């Protein structure tokens, strides 16, 4: 694959903002790992702590080619000229048949992209998979998420990939943890909308559909993690043992199902081992390019 060229994409940004990659500005990308960075807490800690994430995430910048696909939007303060990262978009080139996107969603596509590269790209990447788009709260009225989506689509086109694919984590699903994702993704912003109306209830899904993305299937096991109740308390502040004793539903296997903050579905807690498992579904969205 040839190197990418951001300048040729023709992406317009608001005054004071610039588009960069981790390859071009590793110094700025490193600031995202500071626990005090305003964007460091925007993803739930249990999501960033999955075994797959911990093993593979750093390799997105360790591999020079992939570092070019880690986008940043920088903002320069007018008064003190200080530059900071206010949005980012992570992605990985990957080989995967477009009609066979994995049930393992986010974790599977990240792992496949890295391992295929390490194997010498025996199968040339045919897709660009988005892995996440994050925008600092103070800059969310500037259309930066739109810019990142447009840039990812343009990069996929520049590299002659078949599509940009997204194991999408619906923004508002955590407010409805007991609703199956298969049902949630078909909710409409207007409850009286026609069945074919694409105005989705979920804002992040709605945005992708507005750019031509198409929902193709659910990824039922997009992120998976199992940890002791003490670890879950550190991550979420929830005392799962106490919640389990308070009368939450118990399955035939003796597991207690309970919602936790920022999770899309309930965790499954085992009162005997005090281990809770979380298996998060996402929805595959495809942005066709060619």
UniProtKB/Swiss-Prot annotation:
Assigned EC number: 2.3.1.-
Keyword match Acyltransferase: yes
Superkingdom assignment: Eukaryota
Binding locations of acetyl-CoA: 157-163
Keyword Ribosomal protein attached: no
Keywords for this protein: Acyltransferase, Transferase
Role noted for this protein: Arginine N-acetyltransferase; part of the cluster that mediates the biosynthesis of a highly modified cyclo-arginine-tryptophan dipeptide (cRW). Within the pathway, avaD catalyzes the N-acetylation of the guanidine group. The first step of the pathway is perfornmed by the arginine-containing cyclodipeptide synthase (RCPDS) avaA that acts as the scaffold-generating enzyme and is responsible for formation of the cyclo-Arg-Trp (cRW) diketopiperazine.
Name this protein carries in UniProt: Arginine N-acetyltransferase avaD
Lineage: Eukaryota, Fungi, Dikarya, Ascomycota, Pezizomycotina
């Amino acid at each position: 694959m040839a190197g990418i060229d951001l300048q040729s994409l023709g992406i317009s940004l608001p005054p004071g903002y610039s588009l960069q990659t981790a390859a071009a500005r590793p110094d700025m990308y490193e600031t995202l790992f500071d626990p005090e960075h305003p964007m460091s807490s925007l993803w739930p800690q249990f999501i960033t702590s999955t075994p797959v994430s911990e093993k593979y995430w750093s390799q997105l910048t360790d591999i020079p080619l992939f570092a070019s696909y880690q986008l940043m939007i920088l903002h320069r303060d007018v008064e003190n000229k200080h530059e900071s990262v206010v949005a980012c978009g992570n992605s990985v080139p990957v080989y995967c048949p477009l009609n066979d996107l994995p049930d393992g969603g986010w974790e599977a596509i990240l792992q496949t992209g890295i391992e295929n590269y390490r194997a010498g790209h025996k199968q040339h990447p045919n897709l660009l998979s988005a892995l996440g788009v994050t925008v600092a709260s103070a800059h969310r009225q500037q259309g930066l998420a739109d810019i990142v989506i447009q840039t990812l689509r343009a990069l996929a086109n520049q590299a002659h990939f078949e599509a940009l694919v997204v194991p999408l984590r619906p923004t508002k699903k955590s407010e409805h943890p007991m609703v199956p994702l298969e049902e949630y993704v078909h909710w409409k912003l207007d409850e009286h909308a026609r069945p074919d109306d694409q105005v989705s209830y979920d804002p992040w899904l709605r945005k992708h559909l507005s750019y031509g993305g198409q929902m193709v299937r659910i990824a039922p096991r997009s992120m998976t993690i199992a940890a002791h109740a003490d670890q879950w308390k550190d991550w979420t502040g929830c005392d799962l043992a106490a919640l389990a004793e308070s009368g939450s539903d118990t399955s035939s296997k003796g597991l207690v199902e309970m919602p936790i903050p920022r999770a899309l579905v309930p965790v499954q807690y085992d009162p005997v081992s005090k281990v809770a498992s979380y298996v998060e579904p996402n929805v595959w969205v495809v942005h066709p390019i060619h």
